[in-house]
Amino acid sequence: MTETLILRGAYAITDPRLGPRGVISGGAVVITDGRVVETGSFAALAPRYPGARVLGDGTQLLMPGLVDAHSHGRGLSPIQKGVRNDFLENALFDWAYMPILPPELTAAICAWRHLRSGCTLLHHNGFDDDGPEGARRAHIAIKTYLAAGIRLAFSPGVRDESKLAMGGEELIGTLPPDLREAARPFVFFDKAAFADEYFQLFDELYDTYNNADTRILLAPCWAHGASEAFLRRVRAKADARGGVMIHMHLLQSPVQKAYGLRRHGKPTVFWLDDLGLVDSNVAYGHAIHVTEPEIALMGRRGATSPAIRAATSTCAMASRR
């Protein structure tokens, strides 16, 4: 059944790029079955849709919904869970002690807070979504978001390297025997099987949920947390799915910048370019510690990191230093 709504406000911002010409005084927006049909003055539009339900009394501001392009869907911040902020590399260990809340709760809180703040589209970028538990939580989170009515991009994220620390293979050899045995599973595991499981989950989520309003993206968690073999498979999967978007954290801290130079012998973005991962369907979260030549390369390739700087997280993690 077709449903038509008229959103009525004192002002309707239709295109902020146009300045005053993009604002309609006494404006309204007509929506039919979830799609914007037209904009104009309420006085002109209302008589043309006599059966439409009107929301707003002419005193509100109407504006396009905001987009959160990089969120982890926690619902509560680490501080709210009892873990204070620190430098990123320290925080990764501290976060292991945060309570793990059920995904139906965290996704619901996240959706509610976003909608209340004017965000109508949310990107949930997962973190360590490997194993059966990761798959279970992904399905529940997506269903919860969709039930809330928010538009969604969802990217299951994993790391096949640097799960313990950057350069974990070198670190293992410096540890005493008892710690070495405890740390080995984080460094030495079947990476081919790990990747197979990840792409199986991605295909499952994509085939189940991807549509015009919900997008499933690929997400190596971090550029420095992915092997070259894994990233090549990510590129191949994106191509096989018609150019699906790829989202990853990039150069979030000075340590990551130094590690990339040492590991690859070149800036990280140039290494990613060798793998075909600087492209118009690749988005980077943060990308704080990039060089001028890397920025120029991203611009030439059409990569989208300038839009996803996650400034509050950057400041909280002291990553700007």
Question: What is each of the regions a protein language model found here?
Answer:
Residues C119, I150, G243, G302-A303:
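A structural motif
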Residues M1-R48, Q60-L62:
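N-terminal metal-binding scaffold of metallo-dependent hydrolase/deaminase domains
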Residues L277-R321:
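Active-site-adjacent C-terminal substructures of enzyme catalytic domains
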Residues P78-K81, L164-G167, F230, P254-K266, ...:
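Histidine/acidic-residue-rich catalytic or RNA/ligand-binding cores of hydrolases
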Residues Q80-R151, D196-N211:
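Alpha-helical scaffold segments that flank or form the walls of functional sites
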Residues A10, V29, G34, T59, ...:
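Divalent metal-coordination and catalytic microenvironments
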Residues R136-G285:
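Metal-coordinating catalytic core of metallo-dependent amide/deamination hydrolases
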